[in-house]
């Protein structure tokens, strides 16, 4: 057996579906600002940059449905549809823009 390499991933053969079975919310997002805005995979989307125009109430408690460690970049004037999925686990949101700083379901 070959030695393991630290950090090496050994996925099973075939397709891997990310976030399988999770409920998805689709929102239309537009960057009304004059600078690009990038939002990471695990950022609480409702607290994203104020230049992004979208339904923040619908985005509460959710993050982008994209692979971990990746991001979506919105160029000035850019608009697109994004898919969001709910945070799981303890559903506590701490930090980001400080709008929640506690449990989402309280």
Swiss-Prot record:
InterPro entries named among the record's database cross-references: Urease_beta-like, Urease_betasu_sf, Urease_subunit
Biological process annotations from GO: urea catabolic process
Pathway(s) where this gene product acts: Nitrogen metabolism; urea degradation; CO(2) and NH(3) from urea (urease route): step 1/1
Top EC group: hydrolase
Catalysed reactions, semicolon-separated: urea + 2 H2O + H(+) = hydrogencarbonate + 2 NH4(+)
GO cellular component: urease complex
Entry note: thermal dependence: Optimum temperature is 45 degrees Celsius.
EC number(s) given by UniProt: 3.5.1.5
Lineage top rank: taxon: Bacteria
Record note on pH: Optimum pH is 8.6.
Subcellular location(s) of the protein: Cytoplasm
CDD domains tied to this protein: Urease_beta
Pfam families assigned: Urease_beta
Keywords attached to this entry: Cytoplasm, Hydrolase
Recorded coiled-coil stretches: none
One Gene Ontology term of the molecular function aspect: urease activity
Description of how the protein assembles with itself and partners: Heterotrimer of UreA (gamma), UreB (beta) and UreC (alpha) subunits. Three heterotrimers associate to form the active enzyme.
Official protein name in the record: Urease subunit beta
Organism: Synechococcus sp. (strain WH7805)
């Amino acid at each position: 057996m070959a030695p393991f390499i630290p950090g090496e991933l050994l996925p099973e053969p075939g397709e891997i579906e990310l976030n399988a079975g999770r409920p998805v919310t689709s929102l239309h997002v537009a960057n009304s600002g004059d600078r690009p805005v990038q939002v990471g995979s695990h950022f609480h989307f409702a607290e994203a940059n104020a230049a992004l125009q979208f339904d923040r109430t619908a985005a509460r408690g959710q993050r982008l449905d994209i692979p971990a460690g990746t991001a979506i970049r919105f160029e000035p004037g850019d608009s697109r549809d994004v898919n969001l999925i709910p945070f799981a686990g303890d559903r506590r949101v701490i930090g980001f823009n400080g709008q929640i700083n506690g449990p989402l379901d309280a």
